[in-house]
From Swiss-Prot:
This is ATP-sensitive inward rectifier potassium channel 12. Inward rectifying potassium channel that probably participates in controlling the resting membrane potential in electrically excitable cells. Probably participates in establishing action potential waveform and excitability of neuronal and muscle tissues. Inward rectifier potassium channels are characterized by a greater tendency to allow potassium to flow into the cell rather than out of it. Their voltage dependence is regulated by the concentration of extracellular potassium; as external potassium is raised, the voltage range of the channel opening shifts to more positive voltages. It holds the Pfam family IRK. Coiled coil: none annotated. K(+) 1 binds at T143. It comes from Bos taurus. The chain crosses the membrane at residues 78-104, 156-183. The lineage of its organism: Eukaryota, Metazoa, Chordata, Craniata, Vertebrata. Residues 1-77, 184-427 are cytoplasmic. The keyword Disulfide bond applies. Residues 387-427 are annotated as: Disordered. The gene is KCNJ12. One of its GO terms (molecular function) is metal ion binding. A motif (PDZ-binding) lies at residues 425-427. Activated by phosphatidylinositol 4,5-biphosphate (PtdIns(4,5)P2). PtdIns(4,5)P2 binding to the cytoplasmic side of the channel triggers a conformation change leading to channel opening.
């Protein structure tokens, strides 16, 4: 039978909603009772899908004073419109303040009276009212220097105020430029181009049940020293009866073996082996459908352009973990390079041979593992690819040199989905 005549027993799950409608059914190894298990109501997320923490601070003592004491961090953290409004008000307040001071000096010196009445040299030339004093304040702080108004040696106080306003203007400018540059250079936005899969999966990997999720980098610039970590968050009651609403338990992603450090050039599947030390060791597929927990995944590294540390976060609720699924391949070899097809990044396919028991029961040999030579989705892709390559080679051999060149030309423009792919493990 040819590759095109084979039936594909693996169903593709392309969205989060499809994964939530999966039912437990009897697999090839006899696990499962065929009943539909209803999930409990979804708990509130501690970390949202976009990485934001779902928390709100309340009843904080001296919140305003504490935020004002760290004014620079406050200006960097607030929204752009508020930061620009603050600096605009700061400039306007300084201009008004020194404008009022110069106006008071002029009033005290009698500069607002006609020059013929007193015959003295004014403290500030061409200042005959508050508006003129305000314009002189703006010219002094911004160093515009139109030339109509200037300070004379008649009033040392006016000279001192010009020096003071120049210093205040430099301080405001430096603070504003520093805050804007720090806000623009923050690595927070770099996390927007770091991608996590919509779902996590549980499947066999080298004979062991593993929790897996996928991460990817949408930019060609690298994340230096990239490493991942994960935590399981769920409510817990201690032996003394204390209720902990968000108990955090570390999930090992290969720290001892160095597997937590990744070279994030192409999408990588992060793996957590469900062993005796795993908090998921006693959870089966049926338990997963009714359990209440959240897995927070974190990707950290340095931005290549700025060497600043960035952090991307996401989370998976229990109903977002697909038992008995694997991720579709996204990395394919094409001519002299590798191509990444992000249209398959979030897609998974079901593997019915995955045991439905917990890893604990699997270790205790209560259930038999399926054959390691069982047919899988990647194998089918590889067979289809080889069959198509053989057909193409056969057609090319039957053509002449000129016809062979004509045959190769449209193949270079074939869409990515139509080109022969190799299995992910062969690349």
């Amino acid at each position: 039978m040819t590759a095109s005549g084979r039936t594909n027993p693996y169903s593709i799950v392309s969205s989060e909603e499809d994964g939530l409608h999966l039912v437990t059914m009897s697999g090839a190894n006899g696990f499962g009772n065929g009943k539909v298990h209803t999930r409990r109501r979804c708990r509130n997320r501690f970390v949202k899908k976009n990485g934001q923490c779902n928390i709100e601070f309340a009843n904080m003592d001296e919140k305003s004073q504490r935020y004002l004491a760290d004014m620079f961090t406050t200006c960097v953290d607030i929204r752009w419109r508020y930061m620009l409004l603050i600096f605009s008000l700061a400039f306007l307040a300084s201009w008004l303040l020194f404008g009022v001071i110069f106006w008071v000096i002029a009033v005290a010196h009698g500069d607002l009276e006609p020059a013929e009445a007193h015959g003295r040299t004014p403290c500030v030339l061409q200042v005959h009212g508050f508006m003129a004093a305000f314009l002189f304040s703006i010219e002094t702080q911004t160093t515009i220097g139109y030339g109509l108004r200037c300070v004379t040696e008649e009033c040392p106080v006016a000279v001192f105020m010009v020096v003071a306003q120049s210093i205040v203007g430099c301080i405001i400018d430096s603070f504003m430029i520093g805050a804007i540059m720090a806000k623009m250079a923050r690595p927070k936005k770099r996390a927007q181009t770091l991608l996590f899969s919509h779902n996590a999966v549980v499947a066999l990997r080298d004979g062991k049940l593993c929790l897996m999720w996928r991460v990817g980098n949408l930019r060609k610039s690298h994340i230096v020293e990239a490493h991942v970590r994960a935590q399981l968050i769920k409510p817990r009651v201690t032996e003394e009866g204390e209720y902990i609403p968000l108990d955090q338990i570390d999930i090992d992603v290969g720290f001892d073996k160095g597997l937590d450090r990744i070279f994030l050039v192409s999408p990588i599947t992060i793996l957590h082996e469900i062993d005796e030390a795993s908090p998921l060791f006693g959870i089966s597929r049926q338990d997963l459908e009714t359990d209440d927990f959240e897995i927070v995944v974190i990707l950290e590294g340095m931005v290549e352009a700025t060497a600043m540390t960035t952090q991307a976060r996401s989370s998976y609720l229990a109903n977002e973990i697909l038992w008995g699924h694997r991720f579709e391949p996204v990395l394919f070899e094409e001519k002299n390079q590798y191509k990444i097809d992000y249209s398959h990044f979030h897609k998974t396919y079901e593997v019915p041979s995955t045991p439905r028991c917990s890893a604990k029961d699997l270790v205790e040999n209560k259930f038999l593992l399926p054959s390691t030579n069982s047919f899988c989705y990647e194998n089918e892709l590889a067979f289809l690819s080889r069959d198509e390559e053989d057909e193409v080679d056969g057609e090319q051999d039957s053509l002449g040199p000129q016809a062979r060149r004509d045959f190769d030309r449209p193949q270079a423009g074939t869409a990515l989905e139509q080109r022969p792919y190799r299995r992910e493990s062969e690349i």
